[in-house]
Amino acid sequence: MSIYLQTKARPVKDLPMGEAERKARIELAAAYRIFDMLGWDQLIFNHITLRVPGPEHRFLINPFGLHYSEITASSLLLIDLEGNSLRESKWPVNRAGYVIHSALHESQPEAHCVMHTHTTTGMAVACLKDGLSPHNFYGAMLQGMVAYHDFEGISVEPGEKERLTRDIGDKRAVILRNHGLLAWGRDVAQAFLTLWTLQRACDVQIAAASAGAVYPLTPAAIAQSVRESGQGEKRTCDDVFAAMQRMVDARDPSYRD
């Protein structure tokens, strides 16, 4: 089966681009450049998607063929839940990106933004039988908040969507076993901070394990970390993402084009 989604472009004639879509495009393009800056890119693969406000269940996804460093607001593809491109573009949609992301956008009303990565330490933890350890600063914050989904290949079969959403439930941090990491949120900022925390937990876990025996945290300390972490607090999420966006603006603001 091809990794290119075989749907015909069905551009909506005279489809207006309102302010909400313009804002979403800039924000999502910024996220792609932030991922590139952090080294979370993977050639032309992996995806970040963002639902465009409105009743139509349309969302933006990266053009399959562009590196994250090349993505701009205007180059993003607008597609529906069937994977149809709603604006003219020479770029196709990646099938796996559509399957994984549309599953969450369709089933989880709060999943406005979905992010997926194949970082080295993220994939390493995804390959471990016991998964994410709670015995570090970041892992403790996520205790009880991480969902797991078993490996089913490259995620190109539509039938996987139901199993994926069932396994994820309402947990915003996800480990795709033997595959990679995934996070979602009410907006780009929440999804980003969730994924960043999960990524840091994986980084520390792999680094600590390579150095020797890990000093375990007590259940009480882990529970306290969960209570005090403020995971998902809107102001924190917004401030973090705004700071990262300023860094990207200072490096190369062309993503806004």
Model-identified regions with their sequence ranges:
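Glycine-rich flexible loops
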Residues: M1-D257
